[in-house]
């Protein structure tokens, strides 16, 4: 694979999701059907990408959340690529953050990792299904502790 333009901007999963969703809506409104094989390929790529991306945390993000998140990360000395990974993947453990931040052992203390983790989990929305599972599991644990 060859890099055509190394200065191209990086896009978050949220931006790709919004772009493809808008493109899909425009096609519906214009009523254009699949005519050429190129158009069919584009439709397939759009469909598969939306299918994958809609299962990620970006589905619950908004421009305001992204802006707030990036502003909160200014105090951490992270590269653009690292910020993008944190935004796209919404890590919930210190290990996940250490995997996303290059040379994290040298660059970040445990306190900084915990602060970064708190920033990620407090600003970026969680998957509703994950929250429900978490609540269900904690209720089950409470029921097991209280045999009354």
From Swiss-Prot:
InterPro entries: HRDC-like_sf, RNA_pol_Rpb4/RPC9_core, Rpb4/RPC9, Rpb4/RPC9_sf, RPC9. Its main location: nucleus. Keywords: Antiviral defense, Cell membrane, DNA-directed RNA polymerase, Immunity, Innate immunity, Membrane, Nucleus, Transcription. GO terms for biological process: defense response to virus; innate immune response; neuropeptide signaling pathway; transcription by RNA polymerase III; transcription initiation at RNA polymerase III promoter. It is a peripheral membrane protein. The keyword Nucleus applies. GO terms for molecular function: calcitonin gene-related peptide receptor activity; DNA-directed RNA polymerase activity; nucleotide binding. It is found in: Nucleus; Cell membrane. Ubiquitous. Most prevalent in testis. Residues 124-148 are annotated as: Disordered. One of its GO terms (cellular component) is acrosomal vesicle. Belongs to the eukaryotic RPC9 RNA polymerase subunit family. DNA-dependent RNA polymerase catalyzes the transcription of DNA into RNA using the four ribonucleoside triphosphates as substrates. Specific peripheric component of RNA polymerase III (Pol III) which synthesizes small non-coding RNAs including 5S rRNA, snRNAs, tRNAs and miRNAs from at least 500 distinct genomic loci. With POLR3H/RPC8 forms a mobile stalk that protrudes from Pol III core and functions primarily in transcription initiation. Pol III plays a key role in sensing and limiting infection by intracellular bacteria and DNA viruses. Accessory protein for the calcitonin gene-related peptide (CGRP) receptor. It modulates CGRP responsiveness in a variety of tissues. Component of the RNA polymerase III complex consisting of 17 subunits: a ten-subunit horseshoe-shaped catalytic core composed of POLR3A/RPC1, POLR3B/RPC2, POLR1C/RPAC1, POLR1D/RPAC2, POLR3K/RPC10, POLR2E/RPABC1, POLR2F/RPABC2, POLR2H/RPABC3, POLR2K/RPABC4 and POLR2L/RPABC5; a mobile stalk composed of two subunits POLR3H/RPC8 and CRCP/RPC9, protruding from the core and functioning primarily in transcription initiation; and additional subunits homologous to general transcription factors of the RNA polymerase II machinery, POLR3C/RPC3-POLR3F/RPC6-POLR3G/RPC7 heterotrimer required for transcription initiation and POLR3D/RPC4-POLR3E/RPC5 heterodimer involved in both transcription initiation and termination. This is DNA-directed RNA polymerase III subunit RPC9. It comes from Homo sapiens. The gene is CRCP.
